[in-house]
């Protein structure tokens, strides 16, 4: 009996390891919309929806900009044989979901998406195909899945069906579907993948129209299970429960590549630190709440402005901007003659301004510099990498990609703490 126990222990040790998933940097949809002149229309629609969500008590942190400013994507696979998906690795949410094969069918023609195909007699008379008059709500919403990788459960011999459904409200629409269980692999096929068997994931039957304008297929949530829709275990929690990692941690490194698109953008390291990109000294801060990666931010300063009011903050890999209270941002903007553009919800600043912001977490100050805080939209037109958080429920600050490009984030799931280490230059 003892020999069997020793063998099991040895197998567990062999199975545990450290894995890496490289990231691809894309231009955030927000930046593309600003350049195309469509951002203000997007913001108007988003604000109307968010007010409705607030009334219905459905607002989550991931709703703030509806993934309009996500910047880094990684590759995962689901099923056996493997089916590929590009996902946002998002510490601001907890569910893994990808489009299901049922989300789009070729038999639902694009001609059904014209305005004359609304329900009723008008549809029957004027629509180019009478079949479009049936289930018109579906016809109008399927297009977002058309060009996505979609999961086909019939093609996976490790798939397990469940009877649970899910729905997540975003700032610009929603995603909904049902849960399945299958083998999830973090990393591209043929690479050194973290293989997580029998993992819950969402199969989206519908995704908001906004997602049709993005490269992503789905979302890989990396926050805690308490935040998960349906209460299902996030894949990384499942991996830790199965003893697949050397340590119950993961490390995030984002590389500053300017405005380049489709290039290497950093790496997630599962089960260990990242000595190749992060300095050895790590300062940890205990989480105040283990739902998001939430902690106390003691103070902020920039040039002649400072405040030690103290706020709740989260680290969020799914946003290319930082979020902060309105009063704080307006005080910071004044230091650099920045102007708030209400219709855009953003702060315009001279591209030559050396915007720096220090935040205090625990006993340490962390500096964000102009290379990460001043974003060029067009020639001689720049914005500060911040948005206002005042209308949202929850933490007052989001430290997003501008902060993570300065400091590697080490997420300690077991000890419920987050660590920060300076990026190597």
From Swiss-Prot:
Enzyme class of the recorded protein, top EC level: hydrolase
Processing and modification events after translation: Cleaved into a mature form.
Catalytic center residues: 90, 316
Entry's pH dependence statement: Optimum pH is 5.
Signal sequence extent: 1-16
Gene Ontology BP, a term: proteolysis
InterPro entries: Aspartic_peptidase_A1, Aspartic_peptidase_AS, Pepsin-like_dom, PEPTIDASE_A1, Peptidase_aspartic_dom_sf
Regulation: Inhibited by pepstatin A.
SUPFAM superfamilies, per the entry: Acid proteases (SSF50630)
The UniProt record lists the keyword Signal: yes
GO cellular component, one term: lysosome
Glycosylation sites recorded in the entry for this protein: 163, 197, 304, 354, 365
The EC number(s) this enzyme carries: 3.4.23.-
Domain of life: Eukaryota
Tissue specificity note: Expressed in intestine, amphidal glands and excretory gland (at protein level).
Chain segments annotated as coiled-coil in the UniProt record: none
Role summary: Aspartic protease which cleaves several human serum proteins including hemoglobin, fibrinogen and albumin. Appears to cleave preferentially between P1 (Ala, Leu, Val, Phe and Gly) and P1' (Ala and Leu) residues.
Family label: Belongs to the peptidase A1 family.
PANTHER family: BETA-SITE APP-CLEAVING ENZYME, ISOFORM A-RELATED, PEPTIDASE A1 DOMAIN-CONTAINING PROTEIN
Protein name per the record: Aspartic protease 2
Organism: Necator americanus
Gene for this chain: apr-2
């Amino acid at each position: 009996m003892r020999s069997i126990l020793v063998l099991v222990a040895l197998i567990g040790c062999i199975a545990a390891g450290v894995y890496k998933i490289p990231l691809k940097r894309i231009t955030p949809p927000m930046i593309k919309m600003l350049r195309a002149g469509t951002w203000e229309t997007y913001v108007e629609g988003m604000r109307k929806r968010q007010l409705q969500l607030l009334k219905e008590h459905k607002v989550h942190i991931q709703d703030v900009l509806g993934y309009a400013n996500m910047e880094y994507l990684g590759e995962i696979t689901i099923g056996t044989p493997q089916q590929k998906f590009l996902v946002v690795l998002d510490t601001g949410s907890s569910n893994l979901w990808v489009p299901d094969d049922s989300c789009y069918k070729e038999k639902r023609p694009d001609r059904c998406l014209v305005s004359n195909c609304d329900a009723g007699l008008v549809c029957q008379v004027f629509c180019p195909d009478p079949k479009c008059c049936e289930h018109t709500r579906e016809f109008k919403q399927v297009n977002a899945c058309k060009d996505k990788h979609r999961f086909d459960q019939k093609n996976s011999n490790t798939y397990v069906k469940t009877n649970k459904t899910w729905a997540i409200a975003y700032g610009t629409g929603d995603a909904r579907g049902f849960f399945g269980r299958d083998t999830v692999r973090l990393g591209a096929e043929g690479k050194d993948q973290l293989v997580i068997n029998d993992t819950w994931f969402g199969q989206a039957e519908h995704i908001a129209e906004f997602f049709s304008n993005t490269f992503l297929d789905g979302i890989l949530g990396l926050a805690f299970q308490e935040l998960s829709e349906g209460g299902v275990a996030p894949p990384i929690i499942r991996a830790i429960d199965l003893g697949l990692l050397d340590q119950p941690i993961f490390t995030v490194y984002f590389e500053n590549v300017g405005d380049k698109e489709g290039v290497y953008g950093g790496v997630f390291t599962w089960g260990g630190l990242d000595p190749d990109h992060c300095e050895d000294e790590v300062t940890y801060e205990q989480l105040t709440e283990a739902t998001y990666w939430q902690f106390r931010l003691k103070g902020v300063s920039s040039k002649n402005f400072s405040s030690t009011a103290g706020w709740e903050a989260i680290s969020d890999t799914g946003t290319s901007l930082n979020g902060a209270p309105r009063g704080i941002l307006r005080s910071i903007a004044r230091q650099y003659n920045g102007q708030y553009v209400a219709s855009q919800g953003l702060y315009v600043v001279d591209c030559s301004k050396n915007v720096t912001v220090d935040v205090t977490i625990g006993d340490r100050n962390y500096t964000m510099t102009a290379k990460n805080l001043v974003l060029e939209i067009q020639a001689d037109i720049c914005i500060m990498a911040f948005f206002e958080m005042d209308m949202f429920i929850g933490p007052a600050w989001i430290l997003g990609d501008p902060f993570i490009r300065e400091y590697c984030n080490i997420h300690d799931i077991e000890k419920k703490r987050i660590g920060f280490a300076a990026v190597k230059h």
